[in-house]
Amino acid sequence: MDQNGMEIPVTLIIKAPNQKYSDQTISCFLNWTVGKLKTHLSNVYPSKPLTKDQRLVYSGRLLPDHLQLKDILRKQDEYHMVHLVCTSRTPPSSPKSSTNRESHEALASNSNSSSDQSGSSTPSSSQETLTLATSSSSEGLRQRTLPQAQTDPAQSHQVPYVMQGNVDNQLPGQAVPAGFPVYPAFNPLQMLWWQQMYAHQYYMQYQAAVSAQATSNANPAQPAATQPLNLAHVPGEEPPPAPNLVAQENRPMNENVQMNAQGGPVLNEEDFNRDWLDWMYTFSRAAILLSIVYFYSSFSRFIMVMGAMLLVYLHQAGWFPFRQEGVQHQAPNNNAEVNNDVQNANNLELEEMERLMDDGLEDESGEDAGEDASAIQRPGLMASAWSFITTFFTSLIPEGPPQVAN
């Protein structure tokens, strides 16, 4: 490009990082050097900064004085953004300095006139006037120290303030006691309340399990369930047993009772309200299974499988119960002993629960597993073989969808 082309003016936008002055638009030429631009800014810029104190930054790069603008500026940009940074030796003067100086002189003259008229002014009043003048001259600056921290440090240590956002936004009314953390964790009372709630829920679940086990063993569940709640029970005032306890003991109990979440057995409405589509689906599955057995085996095997499936179905329906019910047949004269044993067992279990809660409920799972293992009798060889066979043939029979608890 020739010399005439270098005389084309270029528009620069000078920005101040402290936002003290607005953006200044400067017109210059491409053949200017950075040093010449600084000299021009020292005459044109509002703060009149010295050339040696100026630092020009363009596109994140510090511009040295010997470079020309044609080697730095991008040709495709119409406006070029340049940041002007000045050192602290010659800070830019504030445009409000004259008004602050006038207000300071007015306050000083007022203080002098008031002191001359009174003639007995104290040093504290003059100090307060100077403090007001100093605060008015330092308008716009942020206070980063507490006013009471310098005057009374002991009081500031005794009553710590809660920090909210800036240091300027401290509220003296939001004080906390000494020695208490500013952001405390859970209160000890809250921790004790949570532990009590956990122990209560665990105790309720344990009582539900004990009552269900007592119901399955055909014990008088209604008197036994109310014994743990009656802590003020006197042994000599025990009511006589009801006459229908013998009939309840001799009555066979259904051990496979599904419990509802709200209490009580689950009513399987799907067993009573099964539509024709459900029945067709069940019969189709059974027909497919029997057809596979019939076409891929002999007639004798087909009859054997049909008989086994029929026996398993009748067993599931309750026609052939194989469970021993010797525990259910007890003498009527042992009702009082059974009630006392159940009461003593419940009291021992309640004491065990209190001991576990005092220990922190650390080894609850191990103890429960040990008690369950000792309470359950080991099945014999014939019972294991029968369970294996029934489980195998039961898996071959199609069943309906699983029941969903409420």
From Swiss-Prot:
Its main location: membrane. The chain crosses the membrane at residues 302-322. It is found in: Membrane. GO terms for biological process: endoplasmic reticulum unfolded protein response; spermatogenesis. It is a single-pass membrane protein. Residues 87-98, 109-139 have a biased composition (Low complexity). Residues 145-156 have a biased composition (Polar residues). It holds the Pfam family ubiquitin. Gene3D superfamilies: Phosphatidylinositol 3-kinase Catalytic Subunit, Chain A, domain 1. The keyword Transferase does not apply. Keywords: Membrane, Transmembrane, Transmembrane helix, Unfolded protein response. InterPro entries: HERPUD1/2 (IPR039751), Ubiquitin-like_dom (IPR000626), Ubiquitin-like_domsf (IPR029071). Residues 10-89 form the Ubiquitin-like domain. One of its GO terms (cellular component) is membrane. Could be involved in the unfolded protein response (UPR) pathway. This is Homocysteine-responsive endoplasmic reticulum-resident ubiquitin-like domain member 2 protein. It comes from Bos taurus (Bovine).
